[in-house]
Amino acid sequence: MTARLIDGRQVAQQVHEEVRQAVERHTAQGRRAPGLAVVLVGENPASQVYVRNKRRTCEALGIESRSHDLPADTPQSVLLDLIDALNADPAVDGILVQLPLPAHFDTETVIERIDPAKDVDGFHPYNVGRLAVRLPTLRPCTPYGVMRLLDSTGEVYKGRNAVVVGASNIVGRPMALELMLAGATVTVCHRFTTDTAEHVARADIVVVAVGRPDLVPGEWIKPGATVIDVGMNRLEDGRLVGDVSFAAAAERAAWITPVPGGVGPMTVAMLMKNTIQSYESRLGR
């Protein structure tokens, strides 16, 4: 069996078009464009690339991107004051603080300072809690994007066994919630799990989000499974690879995401989707 690729770039373009059309519909009626404030603290090269991509996507879709670049030694109080100002700004519909922050910041304190209605990353505990009880919310972007990728396959995942490898607040835990709410039977493997291979071997859906190259060998994959590789790791030779041994896994899976070009584009696309959702909620329509 050779897996079919789930093309994240193609699905992301579909989401972009939905957002672009929504923005055009509103601005054609004389309304302001949606506004996204992007806050970058420090000069982490990877973060700079991610932020540049987000700002470029905003521009392409008609969303006004507001840049706030702060030096790495910025006191936490200054960042919190900036967030307060953005919370109060009626022209700002979404606030994104690029992670990771420098070591002297308390990340949870920063995230919780963002108005949940403007938390377009979907990281605020209020929004994750609403997701858990099936209430409308701004959903965490990467898991939200994964669900859109799964939908694109046309497969039915209700009642299937799903395994999430990784239990981070940003991906693993909300990913498990998304899959459970979609009707899958979900197992989460984390650093204390001793039999990850056995769990993966039984899974119809495998989502891996740890950040370790070749963490999941291809031979672990159940024939016919769907494999979503969230990991993005740069090797010494400059290549980007995921957490799954791609070539071997693709010989067994029915569907698989590539790295790059799989989940990555979807994270940015769903950020834009959340921004237009926040904007429309704030318009009251």
Curated annotation (Swiss-Prot):
The family database entries (InterPro entries) matched by this protein are listed as: Aminoacid_DH-like_N_sf, NAD(P)-bd_dom_sf, THF_DH/CycHdrlase, THF_DH/CycHdrlase_cat_dom, THF_DH/CycHdrlase_CS, THF_DH/CycHdrlase_NAD-bd_dom
Q: Which GO terms describe its cellular component?
A: cytosol
Pathway note: One-carbon metabolism; tetrahydrofolate interconversion
Write the protein's name.
Bifunctional protein FolD
Q: What does this protein do?
A: Catalyzes the oxidation of 5,10-methylenetetrahydrofolate to 5,10-methenyltetrahydrofolate and then the hydrolysis of 5,10-methenyltetrahydrofolate to 10-formyltetrahydrofolate.
Family the UniProt entry places it in: Belongs to the tetrahydrofolate dehydrogenase/cyclohydrolase family.
Q: Which residues cross the membrane?
A: none
Q: What is its EC number?
A: 1.5.1.5, 3.5.4.9
Description of how the protein assembles with itself and partners: Homodimer.
GO annotation (BP), single: L-histidine biosynthetic process
* Origin superkingdom: Bacteria
Q: Which reaction does it catalyse?
A: (6R)-5,10-methylene-5,6,7,8-tetrahydrofolate + NADP(+) = (6R)-5,10-methenyltetrahydrofolate + NADPH; (6R)-5,10-methenyltetrahydrofolate + H2O = (6R)-10-formyltetrahydrofolate + H(+)
Record-listed NADP(+) binding positions? G166, A167, S168
Organism placement in taxonomy: Bacteria, Pseudomonadati, Pseudomonadota, Gammaproteobacteria, Chromatiales
Provide a Gene Ontology MF annotation, just one.
methenyltetrahydrofolate cyclohydrolase activity
**Keywords in UniProt for this one?**
Amino-acid biosynthesis, Histidine biosynthesis, Hydrolase, Methionine biosynthesis, Multifunctional enzyme, NADP, One-carbon metabolism, Oxidoreductase, Purine biosynthesis
